[in-house]
From Swiss-Prot:
Residues 1-21 form the signal peptide. Expressed in colon, lung and liver. The keyword Cell cycle does not apply. PANTHER family: PLATELET-DERIVED GROWTH FACTOR RECEPTOR LIKE, PLATELET-DERIVED GROWTH FACTOR RECEPTOR-LIKE PROTEIN. Glycans are attached at residues 132, 219. GO terms for molecular function: platelet activating factor receptor activity; platelet-derived growth factor beta-receptor activity. Residues 62-159, 272-375 form the Ig-like C2-type domain. Disulfide bonds join 96-143, 293-357. PROSITE patterns: IG_LIKE. InterPro entries: Ig-like_dom, Ig-like_dom_sf, Ig-like_fold, Ig_sub, Ig_sub2, PDGFRL. The keyword Disulfide bond applies. The lineage of its organism: Eukaryota, Metazoa, Chordata, Craniata, Vertebrata. Forms a complex composed of PDGFRL, TNK2 and GRB2. This is Platelet-derived growth factor receptor-like protein.
Length: 375
């Protein structure tokens, strides 16, 4: 009996050693409590690419929203096209949505404070009305929403509207000009425009030189035609100067515009080129003294002068006179000479010192000075 008992114990012991001595197969490990039981997979997954529509909508800038409507008869409305052709005499009414609307329209209407034009602001829209229209009213009409903070307003570029209106009038192919002869200055550093604008959208317009008589081609390189502006000289130079005119043809009719004198500008744009000169730098008591400030510049650029002089604090009476004229410097080059002269009579001790002249134009200002001594 003991033998069988011992034999049974030996068999149980060997069985336990077999169980505890087993090794886990490769790539296997016991799972930890709470571990994810989902088996890993080697399946490739393509990254999700957003649709083109989604990406474009995220990256694109906000589109400009047209806020302009044209009022038709019987209370009908329509969005105006980029260009409109209307008969002269018709009434035009434009409305733009917004509680604060800014307007732009042909300068002709603003220059003469024309009573035919009415601009009103209603609670929800701005309103522009033009009655008894003429061919001279041809041009761009535009509006925009104003974003205001107190008294400071700026244009909302995303909410605008515009239309260019041709007012066709019998016998008028060109937008009328206030004169029979005009001057166009050719600056080497900016475009020049011969303002031959027509009143008929379909009109064919050509540019001509008076002498020698020939057509000047608008080749798209040196000269282009813009129906809203006229003939544009992209890079003016001295060979372009001379007398030119435009010819328009439409509906079997033809018409010639006013003439334009093209003058080349010798002085480039920039702050005034200024010099100062005194009639004498040493003055005796009782004598008169004049100080001259001179600017050479572009023919169509105005210059403003200001003076600082020794007797200014004592309210010393002086005479200041400003003048300008055009001078021709050969080969058709034209320059504007602007001058300001300050004159002091009966020179006294308080008049001695620095005479300072400041000349200013749209590009900047220049200050020059000279000394006048008492002798």
């Amino acid at each position: 009996m003991k033998v069988w008992l011992l034999l049974g114990l030996l068999l149980v012991h060997e069985a336990l050693e077999d169980v505890t001595g087993q090794h886990l197969p490769k790539n296997k490990r016991p799972k930890e409590p709470g571990e994810n039981r989902i088996k890993p997979t080697n399946k490739k997954v393509k990254p999700k690419i957003p649709k083109m529509k989604d990406r474009d909508s995220a990256n694109s800038a906000p589109k400009t929203q047209s806020i302009m409507m044209q009022v038709l008869d019987k209370g009908r409305f329509q969005k105006p096209a980029a260009t409109l052709s209307l008969l002269a005499g018709q009434t035009v009414e434009l409305r733009c949505k917004g509680s604060r609307i800014g307007w732009s329209y042909p300068a002709y209407l603003d220059t003469f404070k024309d009573s035919r034009l009415s601009v009103k602001q209603n609670e929800r829209y701005g309103q522009l009305t033009l009655v008894n229209s003429t061919s001279a009213d041809t041009g761009e009409f535009s509006c925009w929403v104003q974003l205001c903070s107190g008294y400071i307003c700026r244009k909302d570029e995303a909410k605008t509207g515009s239309t260019y209106i041709f007012f066709t009038e019998k016998g008028e192919l060109f937008v009328p000009s206030p004169s029979y002869f005009d001057v166009v200055y050719l600056n080497p550093d900016r475009q020049a425009v011969v303002p031959c604008r027509v009143t008929v959208l379909s009109a064919k317009v050509t540019l001509h030189r008076e002498f020698p008589a020939k057509e000047i081609p608008a080749n798209g390189t040196d000269i282009v035609y813009d129906m809203k502006r006229g003939f544009v000289y992209l890079q003016p130079h001295s060979e372009h100067q001379g007398v030119v005119y435009c010819r328009a043809e439409a509906g079997g009719r033809s018409q010639i515009s006013v003439k334009y004198q093209l003058l080349y500008v010798a002085v480039p744009s920039g702050p005034p080129s200024t010099t100062i000169l005194a009639s004498s730098n040493k003055v005796k008591s009782g004598d008169d003294i004049s100080v001259l400030c001179t600017v050479l510049g572009e023919p169509d650029v105005e210059v403003e002068f200001t003076w600082i002089f020794p007797g200014q604090k004592d309210e010393r009476p002086v005479t200041i006179q400003d003048t300008w004229r055009l001078i021709h410097r050969g080969l058709g080059h034209t320059t504007r000479i602007s001058q300001s002269v300050i004159t002091v009579e009966d020179f006294e001790t308080i008049d001695a010192g620095y005479y300072i002249c400041t000349a200013q134009n749209l590009q900047g200002q220049t200050t020059v000075a000279t000394t006048v001594e008492f002798s």
